[in-house]
Amino acid sequence: MQNEEMKKLIELNNYVKKEIDKRLEKFFNEKIKSAKKIDLIYEKLLVDMKKFIQRGGKRLRPTLMLLGYKAAGGTDFTKALDASLSLEIFHNFVLIHDDVMDGDLTRYGGANITGIYNKRFSKQLDEATARHTAESIAILAGELNEFFTFEVLTKLDIKKEIIFDMMAHFQRVLFETGAGQQLDVMSSIRGNLNLAKIEKVNYYKTAQYTVTSPLQLGVIAAGGNEKLMKTFNEFGSELGKAFQIADDLLGMFGSTRQTGKPVGSDIREGKQTLLMYYAKKLCKPLEWKAIETRLGNEKITSEDVRLVRNILKESGAQAKAAVAAEDHLQNALKVVDGMSIDEETKSILRAFSVYCVIRKK
């Protein structure tokens, strides 16, 4: 049964990805033409933005939006797909700015916007100036995508009241995601592993943003359903926690090929995760000291990363985090089972829930 549910999820996601990619192609081609009339440098930026958004991304958020739309009784899936384009562009805006805040130069297995421009500017500028200028361009690219998000919504062929409700939803999500992002950034410099703060970051930066918001946007697009909005919030809260813990484990123990980011990036950035919280609780003092001295150190080597990984495994922190992810997954599945929606959507939501925890990239 689970294999059949996963097959349906994969088929739906492949379909959504194809449809969203077509819409991205059309949207950015129009923007590139408009930018060319202003300046060739501006045109180049839009070309780079188009290549970046097309290079990676699983299009999970638009897929979830369609599921939320269907669950709420929506039937015009072409219009729902048109609306879900806003989610993918919004997500790209958040990713670009997230990479700037984290100091990352790669995403999707290659250079991100900062990385692309850092390489170009390094040929003519000193290292610090090249990096600053590249990050400035990346911030601009992110802001353009934020603007494009709302532009997509204003051009939808649906009731204006629904468009306004969708805009209000995005504004709330942006405000709350900003809170999660700030808490995440601040936790890296405070160095205090606070469970309540870790869970708050996971809720606002992942659960609400990745799971709850896309589902609720689908409900809004279908005309709204307050009970379903609350149910999706409960579901997203549990699954988002499972997703983030699984993501932390993948980031720590996965390869660059799997994650598209450098191995050990979470260690270098000093990320305060549930995995690290368990490590502090379970490690012997000298073991934790070995981890602590490497957290937030950008100059750690691959050998340092291997050492931290081994300590996390042998201390039981890795296993405890995996159990926590599984517990939240089971809670999410219970919420799905109690939903008053069509069985096909329930089965795909079950498959998506499992995928969030077992995924390898």
Where are these regions (language model features)?
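All-alpha prenyltransferase/terpene-synthase fold signal
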Residues: 1-361
